Amino acid sequence: MLENWFAPIAMHQIVRAPLDAWQLGARIRVHAGDEFPSLKGVRLAIVGVGASDADAVRSQLFTLGFPFEGLKIADLGNIRNDNLSFLIPVLSELIQNRILPLVIGNDLYFGLSLYKALAGIVGQLNLVLVDAEIPFQQHSTQERNEAFQALLSSKESGLFHLSLLGYQTHYTSPETVRMLENMNADLLRLGMVKANLPEIEPFIRDGDLQLVHINALKQAEAPGQVNPSPSGLTVEDSCQICRYAGMSDKLKAFGLFGFRHEYDHRNATSQAVAQMVWYFFDGFYHRKGDFPASFDGLVEYIVELKQADYPLTFWKSQKTGRWWIQAPAGTSDNPQRHHLIPCSYADYKMACQDELPERLLSAFKRFF
């Protein structure tokens, strides 16, 4: 039973004043006493790892508004044991019951529990990571890097594709970048993300799992982290990224990591993380269900490209206007849900001009 795995939340310590009916903390099911919340109809579940840090986020999150009529969310409380082997079966049970776990943890290392839980269910998966640093640095002795390195080095890890967003070149070894480029990973530096935020939406839409590290935000926006940087994303950038993630029909798990309450200043970071969670909820609430389980509701566009040996097939959702490109034929050995690669209208227009973005050329290489 899940209730045995979670410690309840002390609501009187988290929320000092009574909540109004319009506020989020009064509208979701909270594990706040002896009775564990019913998960019937629940679609999102908050899981805290590191009670003091997760509770600091809750104190800000619960006071925000709840305009998500009909969306059932549960806060299960804080995990009693933060060992990965303890976390994985809990998260697996949620995912298998079609409940998306949203983990708030104080270290990115706990993101591995989400990864392993999901990989055990879906097999090969696409990982989207938002981080100022690359936690795959070669020859690093840090435990976090060694753990994530195992995802790249083992064929049994289940990693089909990696998208790394917002990393900063001055924190990254060139050798690591070359290694990931050779793996056809999507690598978007901080400047590329900030230059055109809407164009990163297809990268996010392709993820089965998204992990966001708070160190992707600049220190002025989020001081409550271990190694803050003067450069990084703003809270507005991060909230938009989280909203894109929530809107993705393909996404099955999500985590926000790296917040440390003891380093925070006037609750700036806990407020930022709470807003990021809120915008993830907002994206989830506005899901359109247009991830192509079938081609119904999609318009087909075929583009003949001189530099390609085959025509390119684009698909556009009539419901949302979002775009996909179909992986080339002869790639049936790969997971079917990965065969439609999210793209943008700008990608389609480039193809019509006999050009294909490097990103899509790289994406095709995954299938050969």
State each model region's role.
Residues 2-256, 260-368:
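Conserved alpha-helical scaffold segments that buttress catalytic/binding sites
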